[in-house]
Structures are given as C-alpha cells and as structure tokens.
Amino acid sequence: MKQDTEADVRTDTAVKILALFFVAIIFLAFTTSPIKTGTKEGERAPPLEGMMYNGSGWTQFDMNDYMTTNWTVGDANGEWLVVEFMDTDCTYCLRDADEFGQVADYFMKISKDTDGTPAWNGPVVNFVASATELDIQGHETSREEIISFRDKTGDSSCAGSSCSSRNGDPHNFIYVDDIDQENMQEWKIPGTPSYFIIQPDGIVAWVHSEHPQEKVSDGLFRIFNEQGLMPNE
C-alpha cells in the first residue's frame, strides 16, 4: 500500500510539472511578438530571389545569402543592403541611374580617395537592382535590355533611346531578373523606382516612400549616425 501511494505521488508530480511546461509554452506563444514580414520600417523584408547579372553572366541570387541573422545594432561588421526596384523603360529610373550608380560605388567601397583607400570607411553596403517590366504600354524589357542598361552596351532601347547612351557610368552592382514581377508583387511595389535600405539582419531600416525628402545616401548617413556607425575622420 505504501509503495502504491509513493508511485501515485510521483505520477502526480510528473503530471503537474508537465502541465506547467505546457502552460509556459502557451504563455510564450502568446506573449512573444514575432517580427512581421513586410516592407515598412521595422518589418522583416520579404524574400528577394531570381537570376542575377553581375557583369559576367547570370547566376542565382537569394537575398538571404547577404543577411546575418545574429547581427545587433551598432555592429560595424555587418553588411547592409540597398534594394532598388526599377524598369529599364522607366524615365525616372533612367534619370536616377547616374547618381544612384555613384552612390553605390561610394558605399560599396569602389570609389577611392587620392591615396587609393576607399572613400567610404564605414560599414559595407551592397546594392541590388530588381529589374521588372511594368504593365504600361511601351514597357517591354528583356535580359539583353537589362544588360544593356547596366553595362551601357549593345543596341537595346530604354524608354525610346539607346540604353548605352543613358547618363552616368556602367553600374557595378548586380541586377536581378524580375521581368515576371514576382519580386515586385511580393514586395507590393506600386511603381518604379522604389528604394529600400535593409539592415544586416534583414529588417527594413528605411523606405524612400516614408522619407520622400531624403535620398538613399541621406538615409544611409542618418541611420549610420543614429547607430554610431559613422567612421571617425
């Protein structure tokens, strides 16, 4: 009889512990707020995938390959990402191509000072253009046209003019084929160009539509200053 009582006590204790465990799990499930996926500041950026052109050929691109999930604010070693949604027949994209290329070269540390060191000494910022085809009459793009726009080569036409004659130098950042609008729809992009700054952990840090008075470079400088990531002169 004594043995049965002890067994009952042990069973009862185990049941109570198990019950407390499940209560704790349920509590965490209801009190932990997962970061929402979206394109507003503070949200986790949606997936961005496709075949990319890097100047030499087309290879697979996955934005997750650029992310560092354990990155923390203030860590200067993390690599940031600027995403541009564009259309090779978009006149505004053509207008911005020169300045955007210069900004990309600066923050990607391609631009050099007279002594040969990078002009920008802060965190590395990678740039990617997701090239789509808007549902607008006269907007017809192709991989050949994307290459022509990026490299300023070939005889493809961009917005009625030769792509090779657009303002600025050839771009050094990658272009992703989004002709089918898959990325554009995933990100709910209303029009082009649209710009986003993504933190190393994949969180949206800046959206141009929320800061129309700022350019991409302004947004980067402000964010780096706020996070203590501006290099010492």
Feature-to-residue mapping (PLM):
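Short pre-active-site segment immediately N-terminal to redox-active cysteine/selenocysteine motifs
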Residues: 78-81, 86-89, 134, 191
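Structural microenvironment flanking redox-active thiols in thiol-disulfide oxidoreductases
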Residues: 94-166, 179-186
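Thiol/disulfide oxidoreductase modules built on the thioredoxin-like
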Residues: 166-171, 176-228
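Extracellular/periplasmic catalytic domains that process cell-envelope and extracellular macromolecules
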Residues: 74-77, 119-122, 167-169, 188-191
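The canonical Cys-X-X-Cys-His
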Residues: 90-94, 195
